[in-house]
Regions:
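Extended beta-strand/beta-hairpin segments
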Residues: 1-47, 57-141
């Protein structure tokens, strides 16, 4: 793969079971194991799926009208069994409304299609989950 396709974040331990993830642009997300107000890795996984879809749908529909409500809820079941830990039954639910009028009607007309386009083709995160890809875990020195 090329440098153009490479994406990366760096994660550093900040305390017992607490970490900070940083991107090249300076963004920081605090991550923890479920205590306090940090996100867990599973919550970040769900957030990544939802945010990816939200960005896709919003970028398509807001060209026509800004939404009056735009909410996304992502749910899934965390499974622990002999096959190991994983998520199942992932679902992304969009609640989106637009103002009355011609622009709002145009945005509403694109809503179903934009959600489907995000699911079928645009959202890198959910597409990667659905298609599947190996994850290499390596120890570096």
């Amino acid at each position: 793969m090329s440098d153009e396709s490479l994406r990366a974040v760096d994660i550093e331990r900040t305390g017992t079971r607490h970490y900070a993830a940083r991107n090249a642009r300076g963004g920081v997300i605090e991550i923890g194991s479920g205590d306090g107000d940090t996100f867990t890795p599973v919550e970040l996984f769900l957030a990544a799926i939802g945010a990816c879809g939200a960005i896709d749908v919003d970028s398509i529909t807001s060209k026509r009208a800004d939404p009056t409500v735009f909410q996304v809820r992502v749910t899934g079941d965390k499974i622990r069994d002999d096959a190991g830990n994983r998520m199942e039954n992932l679902a992304v639910d969009f609640t989106v409304t637009f103002p009355e009028g011609e622009a709002g009607d145009a945005a509403r007309a694109m809503l179903d299609r934009s959600v489907q386009m995000s699911h079928d083709r645009l959202c890198t995160v959910s597409r990667t989950v659905e298609v599947g890809t190996p994850v290499a875990s390596r120890l570096t020195t």
